[in-house]
Design a protein with these regions (language model features):
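PRPP-associated nucleotide enzymes
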Residues: 1-185
Length: 185
């Protein structure tokens, strides 16, 4: 049987698979999200060999699980939340003890100020991993993570976060609908 050729994921491009409007809203669909995860996994693969991928709940669990699957590594999660918009993040559920002595990759969907990532890193480092690095799907601000798939200052609408149930009906999140209306979309 011939060897399987290596898979080379294309660099994510907004024009082909995601929609970046001239008004600054990036609507991410599932194919574009998959492309971002493949590109991010390749970056990690070439520079770091984690034993464990740790997703930050809620939204970081999704790219974290996909990247762990692509890299064929163990996956775990921790939860960090903000009680209200603009509030400082707090750890709701810390990382599992199995990070101790292992090479860990902490994954979130976006990173702007780094408040959430710094809190996650402190919680992970308290458990004495062998090494720890960070990755995000979207770098949206000044905080420098170790790996990111795409850098943007656009408002991001993710495919799993786009719709919610209101009065028994699935509808676009009202805040997203308002953002799109305000931007003429």
């Amino acid at each position: 049987m011939p060897p399987v050729p290596p898979y080379s994921s294309p660099t994510p491009r907004r024009a082909r698979t995601g929609r970046l409007s001239p008004t600054g809203v990036l609507q991410v669909d599932w194919p574009f999200f998959g492309e971002l995860c493949r590109a991010l996994a390749l970056k990690v693969y070439h520079a770091y060999d984690p034993d464990l991928v740790l997703g930050i709940a809620k939204a970081g669990v999704i790219p974290g699980a996909v990247i762990a699957s692509i890299l064929q590594r163990d996956f775990a999660s921790m939860a960090i939340s903000r009680s209200e918009s603009g509030a400082r993040p707090v750890v709701i559920a810390g990382p599992p003890k199995l990070v101790t002595g292992r090479r860990v990759l902490v994954v979130d969907e976006t990173c702007d100020t780094g408040d959430t990532m710094k809190l996650a890193l402190a919680a992970v480092r308290d458990l004495k991993p062998a090494a720890v690095k960070t990755a995000v799907s979207f770098r949206t601000g000044p905080y420098a993570v170790d790996f990111h798939a795409l850098e943007t200052d656009s408002f991001i609408i993710l495919p799993w976060d786009r719709e919610i149930i209101v009065d028994g009906e699935i509808v676009m999140r009202p805040d997203y609908a308002e953002k799109l209306r305000a931007n003429g979309e």
